[in-house]
A protein has these predicted regions:
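Extended substrate/RNA-proximal surfaces in nucleic-acid metabolism proteins
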Residues: 53-114
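An N-terminally biased module of ancient metal coordination in phosphate/nucleic-acid-related enzymes
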Residues: 1-79
């Protein structure tokens, strides 16, 4: 049997486990391939990969990108999440994710102010 989970989150975004704990939980469930797809960040990837080096599990780089899609005919906007796998840690991606991080921080600040 070959266990795969291609959509997971650590506490770096909205999960509850550290990247290392997430890898260990996957191992406990006999998962052999795991993608860490935190929201708008790849900051936990290195930690997951480092932990996985001593274990029998493959880590796939990934990210869940928050986006907006607008329907021109109704002028409505919809939140869309795009799971991207096998992401390379290159400058254009880093810039985009840093921008996303700023947008998420501003959104969190606005939500907090409304409480």
């Amino acid at each position: 049997m070959f266990g795969v989970d291609l959509h997971t989150h650590s506490f770096i975004s909205d999960g509850t486990l550290s990247p290392e704990q997430l890898v260990q939980a996957a191992l406990d469930l006999k998962i052999q391939t795991l993608a860490l797809t935190d929201h708008d960040t790849m900051d936990g990837l290195e930690r997951a990969q480092d932990y996985a080096q001593d274990h029998d599990i493959k880590i796939i780089s990934g990210v869940e990108i928050s986006s907006q899609w607008s329907r021109p005919s109704t002028k409505k906007s919809y939140g869309v999440h795009i799971v991207a796998l096998n992401m390379q840690d290159e400058v254009p991606i880093k810039v985009m994710l840093e921008n996303q991080k700023k947008v998420r921080a501003e959104r969190a600040k606005l939500i907090f102010e409304l409480l």
